[in-house]
Amino acid sequence: FLLQDVLSYGQWRFLAGVRGDAHFSLDNNYAFAWSPRFGITRMFGERVALFANAARTSAPNFGYLDENGKELTDSWRTDQMEFGFRVSPVDKVWFSASWFDIIQNNTPVAIDGYTNRYYSDGSKRAEGVELSLNGEITKNWSSYLSYTYTRTKNRTTGEVYPTIAPNALALWQKYRIDGGLLNGTVLGLGYRCKDSYYATFRGAKIADNYTIPSYSVFDFTVEIPLPESKWLKDATLRLAVYNIFDKKYVQSTRHAVQCTVGEPRTFEVGLKTTF
């Protein structure tokens, strides 16, 4: 279940919530985990805001066996903090910057000499900076830019190496055409890229030359306004091509042998209207 509420008081905004999860394992073990979250924002007029967030997530280490072959029942825990600001230098344009720190404790660590035995005393850390810019640059041109830098560390061994992409960038540009046959048509071009990073297995880096490759992907959209008719009002036909050059890439990984591959070249057609 999930409970959450938001409170406004003058220039202050407060958020508090908690999620409860019941977990059951195939070995008939049971655990219940609480995951609270808090947030606070201080507005300075209409153009500047400072914010801070904190959250905790936990879940049992079901599915992992200890040295005696019994299922681990204690829980891993993730604590996350974020601090940042948002500012609007000009109308309809927002820039935001934040620092985040994510610490995982009590994660499963492989026992030396075993292929499927663990103890739950691992600790990992990911910290970094996220920057974003979005809004209307001109009357016809809107832009979205997001960049994230992440530094990861295995606190159990003290090693510092990337287990997720250290640099990630997303960019979207949209332009609306005024006048002519294409009046009202909106063209969009997107770009997504991520750095390479080390593949891991059983919580450890496999080898210096065993990495998840970097990738760059381009997307394109066009939104065409349709003439009004008896059946269609404010109708827009949307055409999209994602991964234009049909790039083969790994989008995300849990570990080296459990990866989510990116979508191949994908075509999408949509119709938006009111009745």
Predicted regions and their residues:
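Transmembrane beta-barrel architecture of outer-membrane proteins
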Residues: 1-2, 19, 33-36, 78-84, ...
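Structural signature of Gram-negative outer-membrane beta-barrels, strongest in the C-terminal barrel
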Residues: 1-104
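Gram-negative outer-membrane beta-barrel transporters
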Residues: 8-14, 101, 119-202
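Transmembrane beta-strands of outer-membrane beta-barrel pores
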Residues: 9-11, 20-26, 54-60, 99-105, ...
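Repeated loop/turn-to-beta-strand initiation elements of outer-membrane beta-barrel proteins
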Residues: 11-14, 46-50, 91-95, 140-143, ...
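Outer-membrane beta-barrel translocator domains and adjoining extracellular loop/strand segments
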Residues: 26-34, 62-69, 107-115, 150-161, ...
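Membrane-embedded beta-barrel scaffold of Gram-negative outer-membrane proteins
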Residues: 43, 50-51, 75-148, 240
